[in-house]
C-alpha cells in the first residue's frame, strides 16, 4: 500500500475537475500553504468532516541517550497534532479489514 502524494492529489484534481495540470498543482500547494500559514499564526485548523490540526507546547523533559544510557534533557518544543473528526473515523473504521 502506497502513500497519497501532493502530485497524485493534483493529478486527481486534473482528472476529476478538468483543471489543467498547472492549476491543479497550484491549488494543492495553495491548500497546504494556507494550513501552514494558519498554524504559523497559532490558529487551529478545522476541516469539517475530516479533522483538526492543533499546536501543542511540550515541556522540557528528561530523556536518555540509547547508546550510552546517559540522561539528557529533551528541550521544550511546539508540535503539530491532528485529531480526526467523527466522520473520518467512521469511514476508516468501516473499511478496516476489508482490504488485504
UniProtKB/Swiss-Prot annotation:
The lineage of its organism: Bacteria, Pseudomonadati, Pseudomonadota, Gammaproteobacteria, Pseudomonadales. One of its GO terms (molecular function) is DNA-binding transcription activator activity. It holds the Pfam family Bac_DNA_binding. The keyword rRNA-binding does not apply. GO terms for cellular component: cytosol; protein-DNA complex. Belongs to the bacterial histone-like protein family. Residues 53-72 are annotated as: Disordered. Heterodimer of an alpha and a beta chain. InterPro entries: Hist_DNA-bd, Histone-like_DNA-bd_CS, IHF-like_DNA-bd_dom_sf, IHF_alpha. Keywords: DNA recombination, DNA-binding, Transcription, Transcription regulation, Translation regulation. This is Integration host factor subunit alpha. Coiled coil: none annotated. SUPFAM superfamilies: IHF-like DNA-binding proteins (SSF47729). It comes from Pseudomonas putida (strain ATCC 47054 / DSM 6125 / CFBP 8728 / NCIMB 11950 / KT2440). GO terms for biological process: DNA recombination; regulation of translation. This protein is one of the two subunits of integration host factor, a specific DNA-binding protein that functions in genetic recombination as well as in transcriptional and translational control. HAMAP family: IHF_alpha.
